[in-house]
Curated annotation (Swiss-Prot):
Protein name as catalogued: Initiator protein NS1
Entry binding sites for ATP: 423-430
Entries under Pfam families matching the protein: HBoV_NS1-like_N (PF22419), Parvo_NS1 (PF01057)
Region called Ori-binding, residue ranges: 193-197
EC number: 3.1.21.-, 3.6.4.12
All copies of domain SF3 helicase, residue ranges: 397-552
Quaternary structure note: Homooligomer; when bound to DNA.
Domain PV NS1-Nuc: 11-271
Biased composition (Polar residues): 723-738
Chain's role: Multifunctional protein which displays endonuclease and helicase activities required for initiating and directing viral DNA replication. Also plays a role in viral packaging and transactivation of several promoters. Binds site-specifically to 2-3 approximate tandem copies within the origins of replication (Ori), unwinds this hairpin region and nicks one DNA strand thereby initiating the rolling circle replication (RCR). Becomes covalently attached to the 5' end of the nick and provides a 3'OH for priming DNA synthesis.
């Protein structure tokens, strides 16, 4: 005989009711897939149950099937998963592994949705957080369902249609942790006089007795309630059905359901007409209470907030629900509530306190990266992304930079807690930094003008923006702590010093931040420790005026792609990009042979390895005749970076050799018999591992690059004419007279005279006497 759970006689308060909808709309047409995913092994029993006769006819096979499927069908598995997720949800709310709460879960097959009713009560839930906790509970339920689907994956791979349901659950789970439920988890609410919706507390036992219990059983949409429910357990007036019920983790059998309903109706929840006192006075046998005890018991312990406190609580809920961070957001989204609070005594101060509390809540629950994804969920990276374009123009791998930004903003990059964009004006450094901090929104700025309180605006922020950073002796020590992510205390105006926790820092400047200015002296003592805390990106190429601003959505798309593809930790970054140590000067990108950093070639997308734009496919209308006739063997491996299909040799003969652009210098492999060339090439790459910092270094860079280019061209010309060289070597060597002519040794006219040796600035000119001999004659 099945175990009958005891009747629940008290329910923890406050209690709320939720409805979870299975995030797969076409579940009824593919119900057999749910049998395989959630209740593997029950498919045949469900098919046999479809052909059984209804009650009250006798059917032994039907009774055996219902008994074997008591808690093994997919509705029971769904009910158990929801119960386990709700238990985890309450343990997180109470911060206890064994929460003290009451939970009732009932799964039902609706006309359109497969859903579960949840009644939960206990400490940790309140009118303020029950509604905002819906995404958290939704994500936990989907996680439990995914784990149960993986039990089938351990035995065999998914079928294509099963994989479709599995990926739908995974996609819904990612959206849930981003705060999106898509209406699949709802809480019972009421509307106040202003039209706002709030979570509605319920009388759990009455709700369970009047709404959930009086229903008939139906465990599959292929069958009917009169097949799954016996006549003695049939609710006559019930129109809706249920699938499975759990009361505090214990299943409620079908044959015990009417008795449970009668016990709740008669004993636990009696009406006013059933209260009787046996013919005696109601106060006759009560114990006597002393004056002091009566006075103590008559005092109400329930605290009732006043109007000001209610307004503050409502404003705090609005800030959390609508992501309101500054006073301007409050004016734009809830002006009525703001005016009501401004009308209270000290209203402006109260609003600052509410915003401060909301900032503390955001900083404790989010990092800069997670809050950016919370504000911009579902962004996709496209090839026309301006952040991608800017980093390619400046010579960096945008995916590598995005990976580093994810690690820094997620506080997972060790001691290097700062990203510095350095370069001259109009290079995009402020454009990039502004897009990052404005996407996060909760940021603080460093103010050099307020010399006593430089970091006054940096507390309770997700990120710090230091625009035009200048290092001074007065604040270099706290700056080293902040740039390195070390907790320190900072001075705040009109208050005591406050603790500043680890906060990522974004710097955009054209100053040398490693040189500390103090009085009339400049010190470089702090340069080494500052460089260990900063990742510097050198932006040296000026942008056109029509480049435009980078939007926060584009930054969010780049970082979201990197966060999904890479492991955003210090170890993951070093492993992915094969680095032993993260240098102060961020490494330049290395493009794949056929990929480009020019935005003109962005239509084919971007490379997921180097970040460059993919080359265009071959097109006869673009390529010239000569280029189209060129065979694969005639293409030089060093020229694979040029994919525009034009004859590069003819252009070089017309225009001449010019220095190549930054990071696009093509240096061929060094011949084995040329050790000098390999030394110069390796020295060139060692000297220019980072971009030039000023115009002098840029000129030196172009000079050395031009020299290497000329060496490569001369070596190619020598390789192209090997036969001419061999023919010259085969000729006979010159005789001494010929060597003398070449060296400038001229024999004299008389045998006794020594030969005439000509120096580099002399030639053999005839004397004046000799000139007279040739007058009127033709010189031989």
């Amino acid at each position: 005989m099945a175990f009958n759970p005891p009747v629940i006689r008290a329910f923890s308060s406050p209690a709320f009711t939720y409805v979870f909808k299975f995030p797969y709309p076409s579940w009824k047409e593919k119900e057999w897939l749910l049998h395989a995913l959630l209740a593997h092994g029950t498919e045949q029993a469900m098919i046999q149950l479809r052909n059984c006769v209804p009650h009250p006819d006798e059917d032994i096979i039907r009774d055996d099937l219902l008994l074997s499927l008591e808690d093994r069908h997919f509705g029971a598995i769904l009910c158990k998963a929801v119960y386990m997720a709700t238990t985890t949800f309450m343990s997180q709310k109470q911060r206890n592994m064994f929460p003290r709460c009451d939970i009732i879960v009932q799964s039902e097959l609706g006309e359109t949705n497969l859903h579960c009713h949840i009644i939960v009560g206990g400490e940790g839930l309140s009118k303020r957080n029950a509604k905002t906790s819906c995404p958290q509970l939704y994500g936990l339920i989907l996680g439990e369902l995914i784990q149960r689907c993986k039990t089938l994956l351990a035995t065999r791979p998914f079928e294509p249609e099963e994989a479709e349901i599995y990926h739908a659950l995974k996609r819904a789970e990612r959206e849930a942790w981003g705060g999106v439920t898509s209406g699949n988890l709802q809480i019972l609410q009421y509307r106040d006089r202003r039209g706002d919706l709030h979570a509605q507390q319920v009388d759990a036992l009455r709700f369970f007795k009047n709404y959930l219990l009086p229903k008939n059983r139906c465990i599959t949409s292929y069958s009917r309630p009169d097949v799954c429910t016996s006549p003695e357990n049939w609710f006559v007036l019930a129109e809706k059905t249920y699938c499975h019920t759990l009361v505090n983790g214990l299943p409620l059998p079908e044959h015990y359901r009417k008795h449970y309903h009668a016990t709740l109706d008669n004993e636990v929840l009696p009406g006013p007409q059933t209260m009787a006192f046996g013919g005696r006075g109601p106060w006759e046998h009560l114990p006597e209470v002393g004056d002091q005890r009566l006075a103590a018991s008559s005092v109400s312990t329930t605290y009732k907030p006043n109007k000001k406190e209610k307004l503050m609580l409502n404003l705090l809920d609005k800030c959390s629900e609508l992501n309101l961070l500054v006073y301007e957001d409050l004016v734009a989204n809830c002006p009525e509530l703001l005016l009501m609070l401004e009308g209270q005594p000290g209203g402006a101060r109260l609003i600052e306190q509410v915003l401060g509390m909301h900032h503390i809540n955001v900083c404790s629950n989010f990092t800069a990266l997670s809050y950016l994804f919370h504000l911009y969920p579902g962004t996709t990276l496209s090839s026309d992304n301006k952040a991608l374009q800017l980093l390619l123009i400046q010579g960096y791998n945008p995916l590598m930079v995005g990976h580093a930004l994810c690690c820094v903003l997620n506080k997972q990059f060790g001691k290097q807690n700062t990203v510095c964009f350095y370069g001259p004006a109009s290079t995009g450094k402020t454009n990039m930094a502004k897009a990052i901090v404005q996407g996060i929104r909760l940021y603080g700025c460093v103010n050099h003008l307020n010399k006593g309180f430089v970091f006054n605006d940096c507390r309770q922020r997700l990120v710090v923006w230091w625009e035009e950073c200048l290092m001074h002796q007065d604040w270099v020590e706290p700056a080293k702590c902040i740039l390195g992510g070390t907790e320190c205390r900072i001075d705040v105006k009109h208050r005591d010093s406050v603790l500043l926790t680890q906060t990522p820092v974004i710097i955009s400047t054209n100053h040398d931040i490693y040189a500390v200015v103090g009085g009339n002296s400049v010190s470089h003592v702090h340069a080494a420790p500052l460089k260990e805390r900063v990742i510097q990106l050198n932006f040296m190429k000026q942008l056109p005026q029509t480049f435009g601003e980078i939007t926060p959505e584009e930054i969010a798309a780049l970082l979201q792609w990197c966060f999904n593809e890479y492991e955003c930790t210090l170890t993951g970054f070093k492993t992915k990009w094969s680095l032993d140590k993260i240098p102060n000067s961020f490494p330049l990108g290395v493009l794949c042979p056929t990929h480009s950093q020019d935005f003109i070639l962005h239509e084919n997308g971007y490379c997921t390895d180097c970040g460059g734009y993919l080359a265009h496919s071959a097109d006869d209308s673009v390529y010239t005749d000569r280029a189209s006739d060129t065979s694969k063997e005639a293409i030089d491996a060093g020229d694979l970076g040029d994919t525009d299909g034009e004859d590069s040799e003819s252009e070089a003969s017309e225009v001449g050799v010019r220095p190549s652009k930054k990071r696009r210098i093509t240096i061929p492999a060094t011949p084995p018999n040329s050790p000098g060339s390999s030394v110069s090439t390796s020295a060139f790459f060692d000297n220019w591992c980072a971009q030039p910092r000023d115009e002098d270094e840029l000129r030196e860079y172009e000079r050395q690059a031009s020299r290497l280019q000329k060496k490569r061209e001369s070596r190619e010309r020598r390789e192209e004419t090997p036969m001419a060289t061999s023919s010259q070597e085969s000729e006979s060597e010159p005789n001494p007279t010929q060597w003398g002519d070449k060296l400038g040794v001229i024999p004299s006219g008389t045998p006794d005279q020594p030969p005439i040796v000509l120096h580099c600035f002399e030639d053999l000119r005839p004397s004046d006497e000799d000139e007279g001999e040739y007058i009127g004659k033709e010189r031989l």
